[in-house]
Curated annotation (Swiss-Prot):
It comes from Salmonella arizonae (strain ATCC BAA-731 / CDC346-86 / RSK2980). It catalyses: a quinone + NADH + 5 H(+)(in) = a quinol + NAD(+) + 4 H(+)(out). The gene is nuoC. This is NADH-quinone oxidoreductase subunit C/D. It comes from the Bacteria. Residues 214-600 are annotated as: NADH dehydrogenase I subunit D.
Length: 600
C-alpha cells in the first residue's frame, strides 16, 4: 500500500503540469491590467483560474468580452463557502468566493474569474450588465450563500420558497433533516405560506396594465401537461398575445449540491443519475471524469468505449422521448406510443448490460461496475438494425407534416448572439449555425476516435430546426454505436490504480493491505488529493458540467452542478414575447428539458 501511495504522489505531480497556466489570455490580462493585478491558481480544471479584485471584476469581464476573439458566453456563475477549507496555500484570503466561468467559442478556450470576499462584506456587483443570463445564477448565489448582488434587477429567492430562512450552501447550515427541529404546520404558518403565494404583479416586475387597459395574468402550471414537470410560468397577456412572462422554478429542488458535501466520492454516483433523470449514464460521465482528474486516473480503452456506448444509448432514449412529446404538444398522439416501443428496446439492452434501466449508477471511479455480459453484441446489433427504419418513419409521417411545420417554423426564433448571451448550449445553440459540440471540440472518453458528424442549422434557431437537428443527432448516435460494436477493445474494465473504487476484486484477494483498502474505500470512501477539477460533457439537453473542490477528504468540499436546462428556461421570456399562448406550448416542447435538470 505504501508503494501505491508513492505512485499516486508522482501522478499528482504529473497532473499539476496539465493546467492552462500558459494560456494566452493570461498574458493579455497582464498586459492590460499589470503583471501583479491577479493571482493565477493552479488547478486540475484544465481552465485558467484567475482571482481578481472585486473592484476590477466588471472591467475585467468587459475586457474579456471585447477581445479580438472574445469570451462571449457566461457558462456558469456560483459561490463557495471557503471558511472551513484548509488547503488554500497561495490563494487570496477569503471567507467566501464567487466564480465566473466564461467561454470563447472562437478560441475554444475558457477562463474562470474568482472574487474573494470577507464575511463582513459579502457583496459583488451584478454581472447582468455584461451577460443577461447572470440574472438567475446571481439569484441562486445570493439565496444559497447570502452574498449580496449590488444592482441586481430582481434579487429574490429562486429555488426555495419565499418564506425560507437561511442560506443552505453555507457550511454552518445543517445538511440533514435530523439536525432540524421537527416540522409543525401551525395555523399561523399555513396562513403565512398562503399569503406568500398570493400573486402580485409588482413583485415579479410586471405592470398591471396600461393607461387604456388592464392586462390579464395567467398561471401556466405548476401542474400543466405542457409545462413538462412541476414548472410555473406567469403570463402577462393582452388577449392571446404574450406581453411578458416570468418562469417560476424550484418546485423540484432537492439540494443535490448540498448532498455532494455529505456523500463520499463513490456514494454520490447514484445522485448524478437523478439530476437529469432521462439521461442515465450521460449524467454519470462528467462527475466520474472530474473525480478521475482529481485522482490522476487514466482508464483503459475498453472503459472509454463502454462509457461512450452507454452514453449514446441514453442519448437516443432521451431524444426519442423529446421528439415524440414535441409532436404530441403540437397535437399528434400516435408517435408517442411508437417511441415508447423503441425506448423499451433500449431499456432492455441497458438492463442486460448494467442490471438497471433508467438510473443504472453503473460508472465507477476508474472504470465501470462490471464487464459487458455475454450476448451484448447480439442485442445491440438487433437494435441497430431496427432503429434507422423507425427514424425514417417518424420523419416521413410526422415531422414532414405541413401542419406541424406551420406550427413550429419561425416560432420562438433567435440567432447566435441571443443564444450566446443566454448561455444556450446543445441543439438550441447549434441551430443558430454555431458548430459547438463538446464531443468534437473538447473530446472526452475517447470521442476523438469516433467518426460522426455534428448537425448544424442555417443561422436561426426556431422550434422546427431544433427538433430536426435532434433527429439527425439520433442518426449520428447510431453511427457511434455501430463503431462501438465493431471496435470494442479487449482489456480490463477498471483501471489499476489505488483510488479506483471499488478496486478490482483480484486486488482484495492478494494480501491484507489490499483488502483493507477495499474496506475503507467502500465504507468511508476514497481520499482524493486536495485540488479542484472540472469536466463538461455534451449531455442530452446541452452541456452539463461538474466543478469539484476537494479538501483532501473522503467527501467533496464543494460540488457545483451546471445543467443546460437551467439556462434554457431563463431564456424563455426573451424568445416568446409578442407571440401567442399556443406558440409558447410549441416552444416549451422544443426546448427539451426536465425540471430535475433545472432545479437539481
Amino acid at each position: 500500500m505504501v508503494n501505491n501511495m508513492t505512485d499516486l504522489t508522482a501522478q499528482d505531480a504529473a497532473w499539476s503540469t496539465r493546467d492552462h497556466l500558459d494560456d494566452p489570455v493570461i498574458g493579455e490580462l497582464r498586459n492590460r491590467f499589470g503583471p501583479d493585478a491577479f493571482t493565477v491558481q493552479a488547478t486540475r480544471t484544465g481552465v485558467p483560474v484567475v482571482w481578481v479584485k472585486r473592484e476590477q471584476l466588471l472591467e475585467v469581464g468587459d475586457f474579456l468580452k471585447k477581445l479580438p476573439k472574445p469570451y462571449v458566453m457566461l457558462f456558469d456563475l456560483h459561490g463557495m463557502d471557503e471558511r472551513l477549507r484548509t488547503h488554500r496555500d497561495g490563494l487570496p484570503a477569503a471567507d467566501f468566493s464567487v466564480f465566473y466561468h466564461l467561454i470563447s467559442i472562437e478560441r475554444n478556450r475558457d477562463i474562470m474569474l474568482k472574487v474573494a470576499l470577507s464575511e463582513n462584506d459579502l457583496r459583488v456587483p451584478t454581472f447582468t450588465k455584461l451577460f443577461p443570463n447572470a440574472n438567475w445564477y446571481e439569484r441562486e448565489t445570493w439565496e444559497m450563500f447570502g452574498i449580496d448582488i449590488e444592482g441586481h434587477p430582481h434579487l429574490t429567492r429562486i429555488m426555495m420558497p419565499q418564506t425560507w430562512e437561511g442560506h443552505p450552501l453555507r457550511k454552518d447550515y445543517p445538511a440533514r433533516a435530523t439536525e432540524f427541529d421537527p416540522f409543525e404546520l401551525t395555523k399561523a404558518k399555513q396562513d403565512l405560506e398562503m399569503e406568500a403565494l398570493t400573486f402580485k404583479p409588482e413583485d415579479w416586475g410586471m405592470k398591471r396594465g396600461t393607461d387604456n387597459e388592464d392586462f390579464m395574468f395567467l398561471n401556466l402550471g405548476p401542474n400543466h401537461p405542457s409545462a413538462h414537470g412541476a414548472f410555473r410560468i406567469i403570463l402577462q397577456l393582452d388577449g392571446e398575445e404574450i406581453v411578458d412572462c416570468v418562469p417560476d422554478i424550484g418546485y423540484h429542488h432537492r439540494g443535490a449540491e448540498k448532498m455532494g458535501e455529505r456523500q463520499s466520492w463513490h456514494s454520490y454516483i447514484p445522485y448524478t443519475d437523478r439530476i437529469e433523470y432521462l439521461g442515465g449514464c450521460v449524467n454519470e460521465m462528467p462527475y466520474v471524469l472530474a473525480v478521475e482528474k482529481l485522482a490522476g486516473i487514466t482508464v483503459p480503452d475498453r472503459v472509454n468505449v463502454i462509457r461512450v456506448m452507454l452514453s449514446e444509448l441514453f442519448r437516443i432514449n432521451s431524444h426519442l422521448l423529446y421528439i415524440s412529446t414535441f409532436i404530441q404538444d403540437v397535437g399528434a398522439m400516435t408517435p408517442v406510443f411508437f417511441a415508447f416501443t423503441d425506448r423499451q428496446k433500449i431499456y432492455d439492452l441497458v438492463e442486460a448490460i448494467t442490471g438497471f434501466r433508467m438510473h443504472p449508477a453503473w460508472f465507477r471511479i476508474g472504470g465501470v461496475a462490471h464487464d459487458l455480459p455475454r450476448g451484448w453484441e447480439r442485442l445491440l446489433r438487433e437494435f441497430l438494425e431496427w432503429m434507422p427504419k423507425r427514424l425514417d418513419s417518424y420523419e416521413k409521417a410526422a415531422l414532414r407534416n405541413t401542419i406541424l411545420k406551420g406550427r413550429s417554423q419561425g416560432v420562438a426564433a433567435y440567432g447566435a448572439k441571443e443564444a450566446l448571451e443566454w448561455g444556450t448550449t446543445g441543439a438550441g445553440l447549434r441551430a443558430t449555425g454555431i458548430d459547438f459540440d463538446v464531443r468534437k471540440w473538447r473530446p472526452y472518453s475517447g470521442y476523438e476516435n469516433f467518426d460522426f458528424e455534428v448537425p448544424v442549422g442555417g443561422g436561426v434557431s426556431d422550434c422546427y430546426t431544433r427538433v430536426m437537428l435532434k433527429v439527425e443527432e439520433l442518426r449520428q448516435s447510431l453511427r457511434i454505436l455501430q463503431q462501438c460494436l465493431d471496435n470494442m477493445p479487449e482489456g480490463p474494465f477498471k483501471a489499476d490504480h489505488p483510488l479506483t473504487t471499488p478496486p478490482p476484486k483480484e486486488r482484495t484477494l492478494q494480501h491484507i493491505e489490499t483488502l483493507i483498502t477495499h474496506f475503507l474505500q467502500v465504507s468511508w470512501g476514497p481520499v482524493m488529493p486536495a485540488q479542484e477539477s472540472f469536466q463538461m460533457v455534451e449531455a442530452t439537453k446541452g452541456i452539463n458540467s461538474y466543478y469539484l473542490t476537494s479538501d483532501g477528504s473522503t467527501m467533496s468540499y464543494r460540488t457545483r452542478v451546471r445543467t443546460p436546462s437551467f439556462a434554457h428556461l431563463q431564456q424563455i421570456p426573451s424568445a416568446i414575447r409578442g407571440s401567442l399562448v399556443s406558440d409558447l406550448i410549441v416552444y416549451l416542447g422544443s426546448i427539451d428539458f426536465v425540471m430535475s435538470d433545472v432545479d437539481r
